[in-house]
């Protein structure tokens, strides 16, 4: 299976460590990842610059992988990234990462589905169409392995089964 170029969407402040674990699994194209320094640089700019950066990154990708932590669903830029992916007819998939440990060895509570508050063009909730992978395991190591074993298929399914336009 070819490695896809994907856009990873996540809450930077709380989940950057968990997101890095997923991004560095080696299951997607290396061109998919951008450095944390890229985001550090762009997040200090004005909203129009951030949107332009997201739009440019999104245009190069076939799928958005939303890494769902405890408060991801409340984040303005995550919502914008999901809406942009839907607008551009990209594959969209969610992966819960709350049971991956952060740099201090902590897990968090499961967050809300970030697709629930976004409506499709036909007025239905995007969450009706988007798969959100939630590992059955609780151990961070097992969750990591479960995500690694499934992420390629999740991405392929998201690309093949896009939400209705």
Question: PLM ranges: what are they?
Answer:
Residues 1-60, 149-165:
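Conserved N-terminal substructure of TIR/SEFIR domains
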Residues 40-48, 68-72, 99-105, 129-133:
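Low-complexity, flexible helical/coil segments
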Residues 34-36, 94, 131:
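Structural signal for conserved beta-strand scaffold positions within catalytic alpha/beta enzyme cores
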Residues 26-29, 53, 84-87, 113-114:
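Short, low-complexity, polar/charged sequence segments that are solvent-exposed and flexible
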Residues 58-101:
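Conserved beta-strand-loop-alpha-helix hinge of the TIR/SEFIR fold
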């Amino acid at each position: 299976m070819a490695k896809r170029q994907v856009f990873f969407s996540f809450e930077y402040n709380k989940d950057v460590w968990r997101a890095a674990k997923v991004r560095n699994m080696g299951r997607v194209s290396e061109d998919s990842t951008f450095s944390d320094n890229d985001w550090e640089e762009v997040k200090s700019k004005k909203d129009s610059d951030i949107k332009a950066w997201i739009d440019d990154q999104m245009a190069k990708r076939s799928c958005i992988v939303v890494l769902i932590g405890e408060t991801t669903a409340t984040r303005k830029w995550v919502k914008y990234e999901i809406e942009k992916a839907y607008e551009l007819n990209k594959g969209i998939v969610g992966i819960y990462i709350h049971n991956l440990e952060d740099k201090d060895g902590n897990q968090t509570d499961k967050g809300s589905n970030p697709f629930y508050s976004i409506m499709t063009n036909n007025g239905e909730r995007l969450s009706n169409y988007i798969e959100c992978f939630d590992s059955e395991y609780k151990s961070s190591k097992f969750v990591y392995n479960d995500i690694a074993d499934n992420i390629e298929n999740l991405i392929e399914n998201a690309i093949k089964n896009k939400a209705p336009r």
